[in-house]
Amino acid sequence: MSLLHIAVILPLIFALIIPILYRFFKRIHLGWFVLPVPIVIFIYMLTLIKTTMSGNTVMKTLNWMPHFGMNFDLYLDGLGLLFSLLISGIGSLVVLYSIGYLSKSEQLGNFYCYLLLFMGAMLGVVLSDNVIILYLFWELTSFSSFLLISFWRERQASIYGAQKSLIITVFGGLSLLGGIILLAIPTQSFSIQYMIQHASEIQNSPFFIFAMILIMIGAFTKSAQFPFYIWLPDAMEAPTPVSAYLHSATMVKAGLYLIARMTPIFAASQGWVWTVTLVGLITLFWASLNATKQQDLKGILAFSTVSQLGMIMAMLGIGAISYHYQGDDSKIYAAAFTAAIFHLINHATFKGALFMITGAVDHSTGTRDVKKLGGLLTIMPISFTITVITALSMAGVPPFNGFLSKESFLETTFTASQANLFSVDTLGYLFPIIGIVGSVFTFVYSIKFIMHIFFGQYKPEQLPKKAHEVSILMLLSPAILATLVIVLGLFPGILTNSIIEPATSSINHTVIDDVEFHMFHGLTPAFLSTLVIYILGILLIVTFSYWVKLLQRQPGKLTFNYWYNRSANVIPNYSEKMTNSYVTDYSRNNLVIIFGALILLTFVTIFSVPFNINFKDVSPIRIFEVCIVILLLSAAFLILFAKSRLFSIIMLSAVGYAVSVLFIFFKAPDLALTQFVVESISTALFLLCFYHLPNLNRYNEKRSFQLTNALIAGGVGLSVIIIGLIAYGNRHFESISKFYQEHVYDLAHGKNMVNVILVDFRGMDTLFESSVLGIAGLAVYTMIKLRKKRQTQGNEVKNHE
């Protein structure tokens, strides 16, 4: 096993160990045991920077099911390294922050188990080269995030948010599964790199459009893009460390990673360019607009996260235009990939810090309601300093890193407006217009975020707690991120050659080796747009109290949340009615549906799929075998029209004993003896059970009822015969019986092949089957004993009375 595999598996292993440690070390905060895990992974990933800088990659394989092309293949290039550093780096800071945020009285064993489970799943997503393995980790992120969001399960809002996120992201996961299966059909491979190398085969496939749509849905749901964004604001009910980790730097970035990774395959389609770009821009505009009217600090950051994800998504879509050009023109559009990567890093720094400060404010005051907050400037000066730095970066104000990536974003939108896709030139001007409007509202909610907390009147009477500055443990992580905001703003070259260029080259076929970010490029359209954004933003802040009321009057039926909630109520009701229509307490009706579906499926398959039935090697039929079969069929037929229970039991036993005789003729005495014993015991049990049932010596059934039973029974029997004959005549693999014939004597040292298979080759199966029977017996014994105990207690009460 390689170190890369260990890096992915390590958090998963510790996720199993941590709950055990929690039981023995309750006096020590469990976070200290967890902290080394992401730190070690982060340090290991740092050692791989030189590898990706030189243009090399790391490919490691761990065999799983090689015959089916499914192995635990890991592939690390510049893009995978970038996300791995974010996952482990931000993860380290979040764990450190959580030590100060969560008290020892919380269920820390559960919390850190879920967190490590999520961390390992995210590393698996960004490093997997096998799409099936990627999908498994993808769904594991949804499952673990569900557990994290619902950590405070006593709160109804937490349960609602967790269910909402799970439903939407799992829906996207199923779409992703469909998309990757369609990708694997033309390439006959599950390897992402192989698919990229053979992208032309996929593009010529009739499944190309469907695969593209399904994969985009999977990415849009995960990254909370319009209209699937509604799960993210409700997920803010999770503890703040979860919000800082999942919803700023990791989980919501998984969709962006998927779009970036699949761009070489789908970028040739103009539909990919337009859809990814417009969905990103619409998300940017809609979420930034909604962020301005939120009354909860986390609500502001939730919609802020959605809008920033939309910005990055739009840049990835614009960058895909480079696949439609050659030479220098291609490099011009490929610069959007560079801007997307840079802003992805910047967003993780300032948004992670802002979430942590929000948690600090909530921890200090007991509320996140902006109506109750204000005037905390002198009470929480360190938190104020960190907030100003990171919020101004989010607003796109120099000299912070957010300004550089925002300028790059505006430049890419102006560049995209000149692209002649679909021969609709004027439509391209929507890109900079939407980008500027979205940036204006981004500026507004960023500045208002600072004002809501630290300016205005201090209202101690409305605060559940007395406000105070939080501990150093809660300030250290956001302070580190705020420092990165300043450093990356002043010295962006630190990342260009080491991180950004290798990540960009993983997405784009055009090599860009002159990446530079500057505070001032001259009087460019992007710089002039920035001035317009500042002016309009300040005007909107001054008039905020007037126009924000219009946004808050938005009719409920026009929101996606309304339709989600309505669907969540209506669908279960209709599902229950539909289920009750065919699932009843009468087991016979349930069996009719199950067996009827089997019969239908069998005959539909027979008439739609070519097959071969081979009677060449069938053994000859002897006269006594025919007699036994006739006896067996006669007994089975009589069961259908029996008039008494006793007669049904006798005929059912006759069927079983006839099968035992057939086993003897087929030279399987062990099976015959087993069948004989089972039939004898079953018959005795049936008779004992019916003795205690109501005295119904005779019962009449309608002729149609009996005929239905006969048709179902005959259809099932015929289906099994046909399936058996088809399986016998269409063998795609060599029979395993030869293996047993060769090794049953020399390896197992046995003479009876059936016995050896049961107790040796399949010994574990037999052991667990015996265990199941034993547990069932204990359960029956316990129920009988409890019944006797209750009867005894009841008699004692009566005697006492």
UniProtKB/Swiss-Prot annotation:
Magnesium as UniProt keyword: no
InterPro entries: CPA3_Na-H_Antiporter_A, MrpA/MnhA1/PhaAB, MrpA_C/MbhD, MrpA_C/MbhE, ND/Mrp_TM, Proton_antipo_N
A GO cellular-component term linked to this record: plasma membrane
UniProt GO BP: proton transmembrane transport; sodium ion transport
GO molecular function, one term: antiporter activity
Membrane topology according to the record: Multi-pass membrane protein
Top-level taxon of origin: Bacteria
Keyword DNA-binding annotated: no
Keyword entries, A-Z: Antiport, Cell membrane, Hydrogen ion transport, Ion transport, Membrane, Sodium, Sodium transport, Transmembrane, Transmembrane helix, Transport
Subcellular location: Cell membrane
Coarse class of the protein's main subcellular location: membrane
Transmembrane segments: 4-25, 30-49, 79-101, 108-127, 131-153, 166-188, 208-230, 243-265, 270-289, 302-324, 339-361, 373-395, 429-451, 472-494, 526-548, 589-611, 621-641, 646-668, 672-694, 707-729, 767-784
Family recorded in the similarity comment: Belongs to the CPA3 antiporters (TC 2.A.63) subunit A family.
Quaternary state and interactors: May form a heterooligomeric complex that consists of seven subunits: mnhA1, mnhB1, mnhC1, mnhD1, mnhE1, mnhF1 and mnhG1.
Record's function text: Mnh complex is a Na(+)/H(+) antiporter involved in Na(+) excretion.
Protein name: Na(+)/H(+) antiporter subunit A1
Lineage, broadest ranks: Bacteria, Bacillati, Bacillota, Bacilli, Bacillales
